[in-house]
Curated annotation (Swiss-Prot):
Matches recorded under CDD domains: STKc_RSK_N (cd05582)
Gene, per the UniProt record: rps6ka
PANTHER family (UniProt xref): RIBOSOMAL PROTEIN S6 KINASE
Record's protein name: Ribosomal protein S6 kinase 2 alpha
Organism: Xenopus laevis
Sites where the protein binds ATP: 68-76, 94, 422-430, 445
InterPro entries (UniProt xref): AGC-kinase_C (IPR000961), Kinase-like_dom_sf (IPR011009), Pkinase_C (IPR017892), Prot_kinase_dom (IPR000719), Protein_kinase_ATP_BS (IPR017441), Ribosomal_S6_kinase_II (IPR016239), RSK_N (IPR041906), Ser/Thr_kinase_AS (IPR008271)
Amino acid sequence: MPLAQLVNLWPEVAVVHEDPENGHGSPEEGGRHTSKDEVVVKEFPITHHVKEGSEKADQSDFVLLKVLGQGSFGKVFLVRKITPPDANQLYAMKVLKKATLKVRDRVRTKMERDILADVHHPFVVRLHYAFQTEGKLYLILDFLRGGDLFTRLSKEVMFTEEDVKFYLAELALGLDHLHSLGIIYRDLKPENILLDEEGHIKLTDFGLSKEAIDHEKKAYSFCGTVEYMAPEVVNRQGHSHSADWWSYGVLMFEMLTGSLPFQGKDRKETMTLILKAKLGMPQFLSNEAQSLLRALFKRNPTNRLGSAMEGAEEIKRQPFFSTIDWNKLFRREMSPPFKPAVTQADDTYYFDTEFTSRTPKDSPGIPPSAGAHQLFRGFSFVAPALVEEDAKKTSSPPVLSVPKTHSKNILFMDVYTVRETIGVGSYSVCKRCVHKGTNMEYAVKVIDKTKRDPSEEIEILRRYGQHPNIIALKDVYKEGNSIYVVTELMRGGELLDRILRQKFFSEREASSVLFTVCKTVENLHSQGVVHRDLKPSNILYVDESGDPESIRICDFGFAKQLRADNGLLMTPCYTANFVAPEVLKRQGYDEGCDIWSLGILLYTMLAGYTPFANGLGDTPEEILARIGSGKFTLRGGNWNTVSAAAKDLVSRMLHVDPHKRLTAKQVLQHEWITKRDALPQSQLNRQDVHLVKGAMAATYSALNSSKPTPLLQPIKSSILAQRRVKKLPSTTL
């Protein structure tokens, strides 16, 4: 569900109701809940209805897959639509029980439905359907798999002002669109900003939003989360759209510093700080960031940035946003700093397992009073795009080829049948398996977690497995000391196997293969990920077509993501600006190792044999000596007809100094890649496939058997130095 507050989806908000004309009520009174008898509610007029003739949806059009969250008023489910025009599409279904909603909450729910029906923006969650039964209300919304942006980043990623700028810019566009429709958001806080699978933001949860407010009018409700409230909301002087820009400043401050600008020991003190305290501006922030924050934290709302008729245009012109291309941002053409670790369409990795492990069940609702049903007249809704699709009788998309969802109580063997062994490694065994429900074939890697922790491998596959040339992760089961990692099945076999057995293979085809593999590696390197085991046996074909686009990079068991000392991931911007040179040097070494492995592959594709292993009689010491010398032949055999550009590229990818090798990006820019249509198409000769594969295996076996280089550390970290420190006499008098 695109609501991040999954433990308590609809929390009680301290609300003091007063006469809007005089705005009675003090900040101190805002710290308590009014009693049931004191509640005074105005019902808003219902102005939105579904056009007559539009086809409505009901709960029978959806299959429940998982519970995403649960609160006192209802549940949030992951659902799949089973009827056209959008059959098989996944949604989040928010189900509210009418009988448990107070009149005030019923009004807010209807208001949320009305607002969502009106809003169509790339950075605001979309309402697709709304309908009701006698006892319940249903909102069918975008299913956002990336989770809550701010708490997720605070737990996983180190980010910079440049990264914060991206999210704030998307948020500014979303808020500006709401304001242009006369909507005050009024509940801007970290939990209500979620990520989609690409890493773009979506504003969600409009239960406290106020509709139909123009710049001449004000709202007077005391609502929202107190730490993010603007002063005029706290003191009930009446508020307009400018209150959202104060909250926007609070979010900006929190993202840049990790703390809130105004936070007391309780609600009363927090409100007093908001009204009176001087802002302590951290001096490590850039001048541009400080300037924007000061312009947003104006206690007089008429002086606040964004309060004028221009709205967000004032904010967009700020020097802090000078590097943002607003048109590209709106079109989602700018790359987010962080991509969530999600795999298939129904992945709930970022949702609380307390809920996702439950069996999804929509219990019958108790019928409410007759007046409650009257309040929700006109609640039903079908998104216009869906009505148009249905009118055109658009054919249903193919059924998603993903396994059925499973709870933590279901075992791997309950879902899959295991077949023959595909491969055996030091810490794992790989087998073919068949999904019992769909009869589809997959591969399962069974890992002994007492020998190796596979969490990094699994996270990398979750985050990057949707790349077309990286093996796709389907499922993960954790049972005792065994972890079952289910992936797509590589039916086409190993890359080198196929090339060496191919009747005809040319230099031009070799360039196409390297381009596909290298663009995938470049994508990983740009995100701070190194594979570190790119031997040819880990590059396979997903099918028998032999098409370079069917190539998959597999086995990320030795892969690493660049992390800070505290274990958090680092965005590319953070890496470039704040990472120590020795860390970058190590990262460059690992990237160089990946390029060296691709150089070995390229040499073998062109020559028909490996560069450093000559035969079965070679010892590991001999192979390592040749590798260490950096010498290999580019004469004789196929090399007499291979292009000069190919020889140049091989030499630069196999340079003995890893820091002098080409980067993946530079390989992609080399003329042998960019001008491959001009390369020779004559057949390349090769040795017997078994001899070549044996030599390749011997090369990597020799590398793995070599002793690692000693890691130098400061003298003070040695055991001897530590022992000496303990023996030093005390000088304390």
